[in-house]
Amino acid sequence: MKIKLVRSVIGRPGNQVKTVQALGLRKIGDSREVSDTPAVRGMVKTVKHLLEVQE
């Protein structure tokens, strides 16, 4: 599963900032290939409004 950060984490609650960092994303436009596990899916669901996801 490929994820890309498309919106800033500035002004977001701390748990959302930490979730984005845990997914390995730092700046807008960063993308990463992540494993498709239930844990990662839950993290993506938490910050889905900040990400672009490709299955």
UniProtKB/Swiss-Prot annotation:
Entry-linked Gene3D superfamilies: Ribosomal protein L30, ferredoxin-like fold domain
InterPro entries membership: Ribo_uL30_ferredoxin-like_sf (IPR036919), Ribosomal_uL30_bac-type (IPR005996), Ribosomal_uL30_ferredoxin-like (IPR016082)
UniProt signal peptide: none
NCBIfam families, per the entry: rpmD_bact
Protein family according to the UniProt entry: Belongs to the universal ribosomal protein uL30 family.
HAMAP family membership: Ribosomal_uL30_B (MF_01371_B)
Subunit structure: Part of the 50S ribosomal subunit.
Stated name of the protein: Large ribosomal subunit protein uL30
Organism: Deinococcus radiodurans (strain ATCC 13939 / DSM 20539 / JCM 16871 / CCUG 27074 / LMG 4051 / NBRC 15346 / NCIMB 9279 / VKM B-1422 / R1)
Gene: rpmD
